[in-house]
UniProtKB/Swiss-Prot annotation:
InterPro entries given in the database record: AB_hydrolase_fold (IPR029058), PHA/PHB_synthase (IPR051321), PHA_synth_I (IPR010963), PhaC_N (IPR010941)
Reactions accelerated catalytically: (3R)-3-hydroxybutanoyl-CoA + [(3R)-hydroxybutanoate](n) = [(3R)-hydroxybutanoate](n+1) + CoA
Protein name according to UniProt: Poly(3-hydroxyalkanoate) polymerase subunit PhaC
Subunit and interaction comment: Monomer.
Enzyme Commission number(s) from the entry: 2.3.1.-
Keyword entries, A-Z: Acyltransferase, Cytoplasm, PHB biosynthesis, Transferase
Alphabetical list of Pfam families matching this protein: PhaC_N
Subcellular location: Cytoplasm
Similarity comment: Belongs to the PHA/PHB synthase family. Type I PhaC subfamily.
Residues annotated as the enzyme's active site: C349
Top enzyme category: transferase
Function: Polymerizes D(-)-3-hydroxybutyryl-CoA to create PHB which consists of thousands of hydroxybutyrate molecules linked end to end. PHB serves as an intracellular energy reserve material when cells grow under conditions of nutrient limitation.
Biological process (GO), any one: poly-hydroxybutyrate biosynthetic process
């Protein structure tokens, strides 16, 4: 087979021995000195990690997650090791794969162009350096990594007798181990790292270990992995700058109203209920990407709930408190500021789940102020809730509740780490390599600044969410109890615009689609391209991605997709049209706050509190 006949086929006939030149140490004395300096910085990192533990300020709970991982993976290994025939099958498959890999390597050494098998992911960004293919040593390591990872995933996939949750957890843990042990994460097995270390005589490691010490100190004994240059951003100065006012606040939230940019506005105001797991300004990163600014420019009177970054004082604030003191409070303020009782609403992620539960409570109480709801990547049925379910079972929740009881909240870093682990090969290890092994400062990126601006969660709120939604799926079953009432989404008759994103790993499209059938009224289901953030924050001017529209969300999403219409670009104009079809009446533009005195300029002070 020739290179022309097979795309991706490679051989080593053109391998030039001179290409090993960049891998030969030229100045061993400088390298030795820098290695000593790197070790000194590593010692400072260790001291920064130990100091809060020796002072009794921090205790570690490594045992629980490690124990759970070992217990889960042992169930997989038990299946394969309990029967000699299965053991032989597993060993034969792995050894056969390595034999094939060795044969391909020998053929390439002989100058033959050999195509990689399908399970070798040649488009993996981690292996972009050309020496991963051109250099026989690194090519062999690359192949061995993918072969072994594929085999481990197959062992989980083919193990019989596992319940769905155990299999899901096992697959997740295998992916975490594979991501951590990737040869791209080590100097001696990553050609680019090896060359850079030789070229700089180890200066990259000195800088990297210095950054490691700084990041552990910044995390008060925990690694606060820097994903972007946070010094380049300031909330209210070059991020979250759409003009507006904070017009009310309580212990749970501030209510913001944004200044009109059009002469007339839609009669119905718009209330946005963002997640409290992150901060609302993901919808207002900058003027070019701001959904809030775009909505204002379409004639929407936009109100936003800015949740408090809680501390021990908020330990008892549960879902009812967030429904009453968040959404209910905001509705009262909107009526005072505008005189309007009828409101359109948006809920994003867990903010959408809270909004849906509040709508069910309002239906039971006869509160009809919210006349439509738009849900961004929101789950109300958690049957197919994705990889976050890995962290949710009764044992893990009880352990988490015990930890939260000591402080009254869940540390923001814990939730941030969980989200980053969902995409460890993209959100953890590339930054580990760039920062601590290459010694390079990360580039400024507004979305990653927002991602690093984590929030705490009140103990009562977080426990209620995990148990009632992820563990017991009570909302979709009509079994959730709020304010002493059992609430049902079937009682929610108002129009729903339900947006899912195709590549969402937090609220999978399949899960969002299934939840559509829980509501008692008409649901317009829309599927956007990309993922949990980029699929939502997709302004029309960028002409990126696409969205699908179709019939009623019944049956399964695959059948729905087969009949859906694909439209290039952003879904935002489609949503605006949906809102205006519900009520297109307009009134003169409103002053922010109306008769209410503003407290401060948007984005307010609550959003500036860091975890």
């Amino acid at each position: 087979m020739t290179a022309e006949k097979a795309e991706g086929a490679t051989g080593f006939a053109g391998f030039d021995p001179k290409s090993v030149e960049p891998y030969i140490v030229k100045d061993p004395e400088s390298l030795a000195i820098n290695m000593a300096r790197a070790a000194e910085q590593l010692g400072k990192a260790a001291s920064a990690w130990l100091a809060p533990r020796e002072a009794g300020e921090k205790t570690d709970s490594f045992a629980e997650p490690v124990s759970d991982m070992v217990k889960t993976l042992s169930k997989v290994s038990e299946y394969w090791l309990s029967d000699p025939r299965r053991t032989l099958e597993a060993q034969t498959h792995l050894l056969g794969s390595f034999f094939d890999m060795w044969s391909r390597t020998l053929q390439r050494m002989a100058g033959d162009a050999v195509e990689d098998p399908a399970n070798l992911q040649r488009n993996d960004k981690r292996f972009a350096d050309e020496d991963w293919v051109k250099n026989p040593f690194f090519d062999f390591i690359r192949q061995a990594y993918f072969v072994t990872s594929d085999w481990a995933e197959r062992m989980v996939r083919d193990a019989e007798g596992l319940d769905d949750h155990t299999r899901h957890k096992a697959a997740f843990y295998v992916r975490q181990i594979a991501s951590a042990l990737s040869p791209t994460n080590f100097i001696t097995t990553n050609p680019q790292l090896y060359r850079e270390t030789v070229a700089s005589s180890g200066a990259n490691l000195v800088k990297g270990m210095q950054m490691l010490a700084e990041d552990i100190a910044a995390g008060r004994g925990e690694l606060r992995l820097r994903q972007t240059d946070t010094s380049k951003f300031a909330i209210g100065e070059n991020i979250a700058i759409t003009p507006g006012k904070v017009i009310a606040q309580n212990d749970v939230c501030q209510v913001l109203q944004y200044e009109a940019s059009t002469e007339t506005v839609l009669k119905r105001p718009l209330l946005i209920c963002p997640p409290w797991i992150n901060k609302f300004y993901v919808l207002d990163l900058n003027p070019e990407k701001s959904f809030i600014k775009w909505a204002v420019d379409q004639g929407q009177t936009v109100f936003v709930i800015s949740w408090v970054n809680p501390d021990e004082r908020h330990a008892s604030k549960d879902w009812e408190a967030y429904a009453r003191e968040g959404i209910g409070f905001a509705l009262d303020i909107i009526e005072q500021a505008t005189g309007e009782r009828e409101v359109n609403s948006i809920g994003y992620c867990v903010g959408g789940t809270l909004l849906a539960a509040t709508l069910a409570l309002h239906a039971a109480e006869g509160d009809e102020r919210i006349r439509s709801a738009t849900l961004f990547t929101t789950q109300v049925d958690f049957t197919h809730a994705g990889d976050l379910k890995v962290f949710v079972d009764d044992d893990q929740i009880r352990h988490l509740e015990a930890n939260m009881s000591a402080t009254g909240y869940l540390e923001g870093s814990k939730m941030a780490s969980a989200f980053n682990m969902l995409r460890a090969s993209e959100l953890i290890w590339p930054y580990f390599v760039n920062n601590y092994l290459k010694g390079q400062d990360p580039l400024p990126f507004d979305l990653l600044y927002w991602n690093s601006d984590s929030t705490r969660m009140p103990a009562a709120n977080h426990s209620f969410y995990l148990r009632n939604c992820y563990l017991e799926n009570r909302l979709s079953k009509g079994e959730m109890v709020l304010a002493g009432r059992r609430v049902s989404l079937g009682d929610v008759k108002i129009p729903i615009y339900n947006l899912a994103t195709k590549e969402d790993h937090i609220a999978p499209a399949k899960s969002v689609f299934l939840g559509s059938s829980s509501f008692g009224g008409k649901v317009t289901f829309v599927l956007s391209g990309s993922g949990h953030i980029a699929g939502v924050v997709n302004p029309p001017a960028r002409s990126k991605y696409q969205y699908w529209t179709g019939g009623a969300p019944k049956g399964d999403i695959e059948t729905w997709m087969g009949k859906a219409k694909e439209t290039a670009g952003s879904w935002w104009p489609h949503w605006q049209g949906w809102v205006e079809r519900l009520d297109k009446r307009r009134v003169p533009a409103r002053k922010a706050g109306g008769p209410l005195n503003s407290i401060e300029e948007a984005p307010g002070s609550y959003v500036r509190v860091r975890a």
